[in-house]
Structures are given as C-alpha cells and as structure tokens.
Amino acid sequence: MTQDELKKAVGWAALQYVQPGTIVGVGTGSTAAHFIDALGTMKGQIEGAVSSSDASTEKLKGLGIHVFDLNEVDSLGIYVDGADEINGHMQMIKGGGAALTREKIIASVAEKFICIADASKQVDILGKFPLPVEVIPMARSAVARQLVKLGGRPEYRQNVVTDNGNVILDVYGMEILDPIALENAINAIPGVVTVGLFANRGADVALIGTPDGVKTIVK
C-alpha cells in the first residue's frame, strides 16, 4: 500500500467514532482530508463540524457539511486530526500545515482526540520532524533567540502566513525527552502564540495505518 492509501484507510476508520446528531471537530492536512471525504458520506446524519483551518472549512462546505464557529459550540465529542510525529505516550508534533494554534484550541474543547496517521509517523522520541512554533511577526527574532537557548535551531518558514496572520519558526535539532516541560517552556516565551507540541493534551485514540491494516491504540 502507498502512504496515501494508508492515510485513506485511517481517515475512513475514524468514521466509527462519529456519533449521529453531533458536531465533529476536524483537523487539517493530507490525512485529515481523507477523513473529511469520509465524513461527507454522513453529512445528513451529523449536525456539522468545527474546522481547524480555512482549507478544511472550504473542503467541508464543498461536501455540503455545515461548519460552525467554535464560539457557537459548548463542547465537542471528538476531534479527528493527523500528526507529523506521535510517540508511545500519545504525545505529538503537529503543525506541518501551519494550523497548529486552531488545532490545539479545538483539541482542548473535545472530549476525545483521535489521531489518524500512517505508521511512518510513529517514533520513540519526538523531535526528528522540525517543531513548528507560531509567532507574532514582530517577535520573530526575539523568540528565535530564546529557542536557541533551549537547544534548538530555528528557521523562519518562508512565504507562510497562518490563518491567524502570524509566522512559523520550525525548530530543528531537538531531541524532546520531556515533551510536557518543553511545551510549557516554549509557550511561556513572549511572542509565542503556541508550539506544535501536543503533550499536555495528547491523543486519546490513535488509528495507525499499516500494510496489515489499521492498528488502534487507546491511551
């Protein structure tokens, strides 16, 4: 199976967690896009979705799924999204698609976070994938200096502006042995909107696409 076929398999597998009559939290990226395609088959059964990016919103609306503003919603049963890396503690690096802040906000509201990923995203230690940090533009250099002090090698992601109007620093060279401590430390830097470490709020369920089928891991 190709990597895209593995992503499609987990995207469709996540449908089993969608309850009729509910509002579904939806992530961003190539794997989440397969889940949106699958969700389109249930559009008459669900109330709608809350989306983590303009791109996902457009795709959902194109399938006839009503998209709610998060401010209209008290709670979400599930949030379904991919990951750039996921470790054995269900902690993740996310933000390769630059939607990390909205993803983290929606994940915090959801009762259950379902991570969908192909097996290549599983790691023992987070950090080989560069760690994205969303930063207010005027603070870019100041934040970069602080990230160097934390042992990272930040690089400005050229020609990318987030849906919130901010910029992304990708931090290379991090071996993240204590993800919660690092998430808290980076989030405390003035000018940081959020970091793409999902450690304080990790996944509750991981659906991992393998050549032998979809593997389910429950926290």
Swiss-Prot record:
Name of the top EC class for this enzyme: isomerase
Keywords assigned: Isomerase
Keyword Isomerase attached: yes
Molecular function GO labels: ribose-5-phosphate isomerase activity
UniProt-annotated binding residues for substrate: T28, G29, S30, T31, D81, G82, A83, D84, K94, G95, G96, G97, K121
Superkingdom to which the source organism belongs: Bacteria
UniProt GO cellular component terms: cytosol
Reactions accelerated catalytically: aldehydo-D-ribose 5-phosphate = D-ribulose 5-phosphate
Pathway: Carbohydrate degradation; pentose phosphate pathway; D-ribose 5-phosphate from D-ribulose 5-phosphate (non-oxidative stage): step 1/1
InterPro entries: NagB/RpiA_transferase-like, Ribose5P_isomerase_typA_subgr, Ribose5P_isomerase_type_A
Pfam families: Rib_5-P_isom_A (PF06026)
Biological process annotations from GO: D-ribose metabolic process; pentose-phosphate shunt, non-oxidative branch
Active-site residues, as the UniProt record annotates them: E103 (proton acceptor)
EC number: 5.3.1.6
UniProt family annotation: Belongs to the ribose 5-phosphate isomerase family.
Quaternary context: Homodimer.
HAMAP family: Rib_5P_isom_A
Role, per record: Catalyzes the reversible conversion of ribose-5-phosphate to ribulose 5-phosphate.
Protein name: Ribose-5-phosphate isomerase A
Source organism: Salmonella typhimurium (strain LT2 / SGSC1412 / ATCC 700720)
Gene: rpiA
